[in-house]
Amino acid sequence: EEFTYDAILSGGRTLFENVAWYRPKPLVARQNPWISPQAICLSDIRQDEIAPGVELGRKALQVLGLQTGMAHMEWYRSDKNGEAIFGEVGARAPGGRLSHGMNLSCDGDVFKLWAEAITSGETSQSMEKRYNAALIFKRATGPGRTITRIEGLERILAECGDNIPVVDLVSVGETRRDWTQVVTGDGWMVARHMDLGSTLGIANRLAQDVRILCDG
């Protein structure tokens, strides 16, 4: 399994932490154009499964000497022993709408918090994690270059709309995007819920049942 560790710091104090879970692994998603990749910002980062990654991320911040700013790291959990192995460590914000996912996981604003961390060291908002927020990135299918129809969305919104705060898809008539060059592909959606299982259930429906078609 592959994850992120993200943090905002001010004067050596950690103001906010996040762990996102990539579903499926990024390499698998890159090799299969029919997949709708997901990134889930988890509400509970104290879970035993991800604790080694959080611990190593905190140690990496100390080694880097990062006192103030935002950090984004990517790591995977070994299938053999559960060890956390880091593949990327950066003193930067994440891409791929992940910061927006963090916002939706706590009803806060990490962009504002980042600015406050640099300017004053104090936060004016609650950044308590309340929700699991799953980002789903869609890719059009079919032989054509132009979006001809979008299927399955209305039904899911009718049934689960309160737990789908973001729907930002291409419109019918637009040219499909090159998903190999754009992380968000032909648009993105968000499913969120306090319960992780419920979040994953809605996210899977958005990934599997919503289809963006280019009929040619």
Model segments located where?
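ATP-dependent carboxylate/phosphate-activation module, predominantly the ATP-grasp catalytic core
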Residues: 2-66, 70, 77-80, 86, ...
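Active-site proximal loops enriched in glycine and acidic residues that flank catalytic Cys/His/Asp
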Residues: 75, 88-91, 140, 193
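Peripheral (often C-terminal) accessory segments that flank ATP-dependent C-N-forming ligase machineries
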Residues: 115-216
